[in-house]
């Protein structure tokens, strides 16, 4: 069980390059490296915008717990990035649990939060 979230992360070219640099700096035998590479490979969607080098990562129904090594790595990465190099969006299970960080709003993926009411 546990609390689940949907997470989106848009990275500018510089942000994506820093992600790769931070991964290369990890000990390849560490839990953080194995958990983070598995996490990045298990996205629901990963897109690269060829013209700009920006990248998009989307995960759904994810446990975003800061004590998990992969989440800690991503949190640390966002703490190091310039705010214009990333946009992090998280929607939790609770209606009022939305999180936005970073200023990469002019990303080529138009990443945003949208809550709607629908019917049949």
Regions picked out by a protein language model, each given a short descriptive name:
Residues 1-25:
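Short, extreme N-terminal segment that most often corresponds to the first beta-strand
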Residues 24-120:
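Charged interaction segments
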């Amino acid at each position: 069980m546990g609390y689940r979230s949907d997470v989106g992360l848009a990275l500018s070219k510089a942000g994506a390059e820093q992600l790769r640099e931070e991964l290369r700096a990890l000990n390849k035998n560490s839990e953080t490296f194995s958990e983070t590479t598995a996490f990045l490979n298990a996205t629901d969607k990963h897109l690269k915008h060829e013209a700009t080098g920006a990248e998009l990562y989307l995960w759904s129904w994810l446990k975003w717990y800061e004590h998990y090594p992969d989440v800690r790595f991503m949190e640390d990465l966002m703490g190091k990035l310039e705010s214009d190099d990333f946009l992090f969006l998280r929607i939790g299970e609770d209606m009022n649990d939305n999180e936005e960080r970073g200023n990469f709003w002019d990303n080529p993926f138009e990443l945003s939060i949208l809550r709607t009411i629908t019917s049949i």
